[in-house]
UniProtKB/Swiss-Prot annotation:
Keyword Metal-binding: no
Organism (species): Xylella fastidiosa (strain M12)
Protein name (Swiss-Prot/TrEMBL): dCTP deaminase
Alphabetized UniProt keyword annotations: Hydrolase, Nucleotide metabolism, Nucleotide-binding
Gene3D superfamilies per the UniProt record, alphabetical: 2.70.40.10
Catalyzed chemical reaction(s): dCTP + H2O + H(+) = dUTP + NH4(+)
One GO MF term attached to the UniProt entry: nucleotide binding
Family as reported in the entry's similarity comment: Belongs to the dCTP deaminase family.
EC number: 3.5.4.13
Length: 191
């Protein structure tokens, strides 16, 4: 597998709808000229933004976190330009961008250093071949203080790995009817 460059990312987004909406350059300021956490195409990746839709984890029901029987009541829904994550807690969000991953591509998501240096970790599982949807993002606040996430700004970087022509997967995410195929909005755990 080889990592793909900005040229390839632009081509795939424009000609094949791999990322929408798509920013071909790197945006570092908002429309008023204020500096923001950058998003858009980078040398070997694409920096995604999170939407204004957040689910903030709380333990108001003193429940046990169980991925097989997740209690949706453990979240508070927030729609805002800013999300405040409680100390040692987490929040879910989703990308503004909708992805359509080709069969011969695997996408790895890494957090942006701006957030990591503040103790805010972004976790996303790989975007598998032929998966499509909005990416659900998980932000962990590892600090003992509240932490802030900004909507409509960069939060994570996607790296695109392309398989060699003779090594394309036999079974894609779509082939096996993956449970998160076509997800929109912030998607909670499914079993």
């Amino acid at each position: 597998m080889s990592i793909k460059s900005d040229r390839w990312i632009r081509h795939m987004a424009k000609q094949h709808g791999m990322i929408a909406p798509f920013e071909p350059g790197q945006i570092k300021q908002n429309t008023t000229g204020q500096r923001i956490v950058s998003y858009g195409t980078s040398s070997y990746g694409y920096d995604v933004r999170c939407s204004r839709e957040f689910k903030i984890f709380t333990n108001i029901n003193s429940t046990i976190v169980d991925p097989k029987q997740f209690d949706n009541g453990s979240f508070i829904d927030v729609e805002s330009d800013v999300c405040i994550i409680p100390p040692n807690s987490f929040a879910l969000a989703r990308t503004i961008e909708y992805f359509r991953i080709p069969r011969n591509v695997l996408v790895i998501c890494l957090g942006k250093s701006t957030y990591a240096r503040c103790g805010i970790i972004v976790n996303v599982t790989p975007l598998e071949p032929e998966w499509e949807g909005h990416v659900t993002l998980e932000f962990s606040n590892t600090t003992p203080l509240p932490a802030r996430i900004y909507a409509n700004e960069g939060v994570a970087q996607m790296l695109f790995l392309q398989a060699d022509p003779d090594d394309v997967c036999e079974t894609s995410y779509r082939d096996r009817n993956g449970k998160y195929q076509g997800q929109t909005g912030v998607t909670l755990p499914r079993t």
